[in-house]
Amino acid sequence: MIGLVGRKVGMTRIFNEDGVSIPVTVIEIEANRVTQVKTLENDGYTAVQVTTGFKKASRVTKPEAGHFVKAGVEAGRGLWEFRTEGEEFTLGQEINVDIFTDVKKVDVTGTSKGKGFQGGVKRWNFRTQDATHGNSLSHRVLGSIGQNQTPGRVFKGKKMAGHLGAERVTVQSLEIVRVDVERKLLLVKGSVPGATNSDVIVKPAVKA
């Protein structure tokens, strides 16, 4: 089963039958329109390419326009591809959120919020050094980052200050709380990566 591309609307909470508050992320999943079907003979693997949303005609390049016209679909805000195993799709076909009706858990992939250049405490959860007791300069610094003349260098992969966020992140096995087909919404328990209105990819959980 393939996944779908949606848009993170934000977080809220709903109450179950026992009155327990459940934190949920609302994902809007408009119809995913098939723009290309890749086959083993032509492409060396099987996959389906989809688009969703809409893009102003003035923002669509000529190659993109030709691609969308060939598929017989309206230009979308991007193109995404899902590998297929035996499923059959046709150009212009619309895939909706109702495919998750019988799914219990999903994996959600998005681009995490960019935090810029951050230190070791925020980036790696390092503990801070003494606030007093003679320490006046090194409250949030890393401390030792190596050994001695041997090896005489800092090992690759050492956790240090640097750029945090703005990377592809997948959160696995999020429970589906509700599928609202009419409003094209998917409610999953917990948080998902990315800012409000960012694109996310929702797939059936691999560990379910």
UniProtKB/Swiss-Prot annotation:
Gene3D superfamilies: 3.30.160.810, Translation factors (2.40.30.10). It comes from the Bacteria. Belongs to the universal ribosomal protein uL3 family. The modification N5-methylglutamine is found at residue 149. Keywords: Methylation, Ribonucleoprotein, Ribosomal protein, RNA-binding, rRNA-binding. GO terms for biological process: translation. Part of the 50S ribosomal subunit. Forms a cluster with proteins L14 and L19. HAMAP family: Ribosomal_uL3_B (MF_01325_B). InterPro entries: Ribosomal_uL3, Ribosomal_uL3_bac/org-type, Ribosomal_uL3_CS, Transl_B-barrel_sf. This is Large ribosomal subunit protein uL3. GO terms for molecular function: rRNA binding; structural constituent of ribosome. PROSITE patterns: RIBOSOMAL_L3. Pfam families: Ribosomal_L3. One of the primary rRNA binding proteins, it binds directly near the 3'-end of the 23S rRNA, where it nucleates assembly of the 50S subunit.
